[in-house]
UniProtKB/Swiss-Prot annotation:
This is Protein ORF27. It comes from Human herpesvirus 8 type P (isolate GK18).
Amino acid sequence: MASSDILSVARTDDGSVCEVSLRGGRKKTTVYLPDTEPWVVETDAIKDAFLSDGIVDMARKLHRGALPSNSHNGLRMVLFCYCYLQNCVYLALFLCPLNPYLVTPSSIEFAEPVVAPEVLFPHPAEMSRGCDDAIFCKLPYTVPIINTTFGRIYPNSTREPDGRPTDYSMALRRAFAVMVNTSCAGVTLCRGETQTASRNHTEWENLLAMFSVIIYALDHNCHPEALSIASGIFDERDYGLFISQPRSVPSPTPCDVSWEDIYNGTYLARPGNCDPWPNLSTPPLILNFK
């Protein structure tokens, strides 16, 4: 087979390509006519699909007749639309069900994995405010008034009758220490003037658990993420947290322990009101110590 050599290649104004070759000592001229249909390089078409006006521009060309309405361009249009819809779905997934800051999943299909509670994600600027901001002052229980042998100590860290600042956190810790002493029978819990629980009452253990959460909240400035772990709202192990003893409660103390050091002690640092002042429409809880 004789080989051929291309002598020249030229392109005319109408888009035809003229090729002159030498084969077996004879010249041969070949003319390549342009395609009857416009053709877009596929890679360029894919790039256009991700532009803001890619689909719109192609639809306009199809409508004006600049692009033929054949199967090839129809398939390209379908693929472009699919790419846009796919990206919209991905964006919706990241913004809604896969967003860790979203507390409630948008639908049951996206209920798993479990979304962390909202209290785990407070705004960083709010974290340092502690109990001074209302977002941290929501305890799951009503904080009781402690009626000591010297007088009442209120949840807003004041005492009766003069309203002098008093360390309510220390008072509640001492009250808890007396309550866990099984030999102390003179402790009762009243709702106003009505007694609601005593040591032999079935709700006594629930009261101890409730007060331990309040003590933990006061010790941690009512930060909600600490309170959630202490109150058992969620299992910290589900979120990679391993806490050996989330709640540290005082040990039992003698029944006749004196309240004088707390009631008459100097209290300068006020931790803030971790629980709103009891609603006047409902009688407050009162812990009585004889």
